[in-house]
Amino acid sequence: MAAPGEALTPQGYIQHHLTNLHVGEGFWTWHIDSLFFSVGLGVLFLWIFRSVGKKATSGVPGKLQCFIEMIVEFVDNSVKESFHGRNALIAPLALTIFVWVFMMNFMDMLPVDWLPWLASLAGVPYLKVVPTTDVNITFSLAIGVFVLIIYYSIKVKGVSGFVKELTLQPFNHKAMIPVNLLLETVTLVAKPISLALRLFGNLYAGELIFILIALMYGTNLLLSSLGVTLQLGWLIFHILVITLQAFIFMMLTIVYLSMAHEDH
């Protein structure tokens, strides 16, 4: 990092924006900024939806209530179309995942320097404001889904049914049990890994593009003008990206849990 009062090089600027505020080292490193924004946005989500739910009226609803009802109906329809079991938890879980992941993704729409600059005034050297650009956060979400997959697989099918699913598919012969176990284990473990890395990769790349565009403002008038156009264009396109990634994470969660409820 550059010394106080010294301008960052382009490489240093990029590295600075991609570094988390953290404590500890190695495996025991805590990314304070990722935890703060993810938990804070989760609490904000609960507060908004609880407040709207308590004030909901059967009369003419307000704009916020209409918006919330539209989201709830959209998620509920998605669950009905993709989840083929019976579980009252799935719809609330899907709603939580969709809105929470979207809110974390939406932090990427803020100008890359605003919050880090404000934090620097308080003596905070680093601040990453997009939790889903931290692979630890995306893996935490994916592992939570993975635990539910295992739990419902055993609950619905029983321990013996779950073991049979791992050992007697796709080849229903005892001699193929080792091959089946290897294939099914890889398939099972790939679910949380793909969930986590897909979300992380798309948001990390999006954040990096915003950072690269921001570098153009410190060059010359021509590139600065081009930077404004590029930033506006990428901002509009990125609205689709952050929404789509939240939707994909939600839909894959619904599909995986639906598969866990299937009793072969």
From Swiss-Prot:
InterPro entries: ATP_syn_F0_a_bact/chloroplast, ATP_synth_F0_asu, ATP_synth_F0_asu_AS, F0_ATP_A_sf. GO terms for cellular component: plasma membrane; proton-transporting ATP synthase complex. F-type ATPases have 2 components, CF(1) - the catalytic core - and CF(0) - the membrane proton channel. CF(1) has five subunits: alpha(3), beta(3), gamma(1), delta(1), epsilon(1). CF(0) has three main subunits: a(1), b(2) and c(9-12). The alpha and beta chains form an alternating ring which encloses part of the gamma chain. CF(1) is attached to CF(0) by a central stalk formed by the gamma and epsilon chains, while a peripheral stalk is formed by the delta and b chains. It comes from Shewanella sp. (strain ANA-3). One of its GO terms (biological process) is proton motive force-driven plasma membrane ATP synthesis. GO terms for molecular function: proton-transporting ATP synthase activity, rotational mechanism. It is found in: Cell inner membrane. This is ATP synthase subunit a. PROSITE patterns: ATPASE_A. Belongs to the ATPase A chain family. The chain crosses the membrane at residues 29-49, 87-107, 134-154, 177-197, 208-228, 235-255. It is a multi-pass membrane protein. Key component of the proton channel; it plays a direct role in the translocation of protons across the membrane. Its main location: membrane. Keywords: ATP synthesis, Cell inner membrane, Cell membrane, CF(0), Hydrogen ion transport, Ion transport, Membrane, Transmembrane, Transmembrane helix, Transport. The keyword Cell membrane applies.
